């Protein structure tokens, strides 16, 4: 009886501890986050040129952010990262506002 009680207690503790964890480290997410940052900074660097020359790269950045939102939603225990990507996807984010301003004005100095 003691063995059964000990076993059930151990299983309960293991279950509780495993349910409190966070998402595992994901090399793909890390790499894509760094690449997205580099792409955004590259666009900032060339924003003194006509937007139309870099429209494809700007759209690729938006598509990458959209893809990362979908990718992160597919992982469990990942709410904070999902919120981060969703913010970057929203019109309130500085990157979206930057791209809109650049497109509207043509060039930024």
List the predicted regions and their residue ranges.
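Surface-exposed, polar helix/loop patches in the mature regions of secreted/periplasmic/lumenal proteins
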Residues: 83-109
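N-terminal non-cleavable signal-anchor helices
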Residues: 13-14, 45
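Alpha-helical segments in soluble extracytoplasmic regions
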Residues: 46-87
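Post-signal peptide N-terminal segment of mature Sec-exported envelope proteins
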Residues: 25-50, 57
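Generic structural concept
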Residues: 30-33, 37, 58-65, 89-92, ...
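Bacterial signal peptide processing site
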Residues: 21-23
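C-terminal motif of bacterial Sec signal peptides marking the signal peptidase cleavage site
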Residues: 16-19
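Bacterial N-terminal signal peptides that target proteins for export
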Residues: 1-11
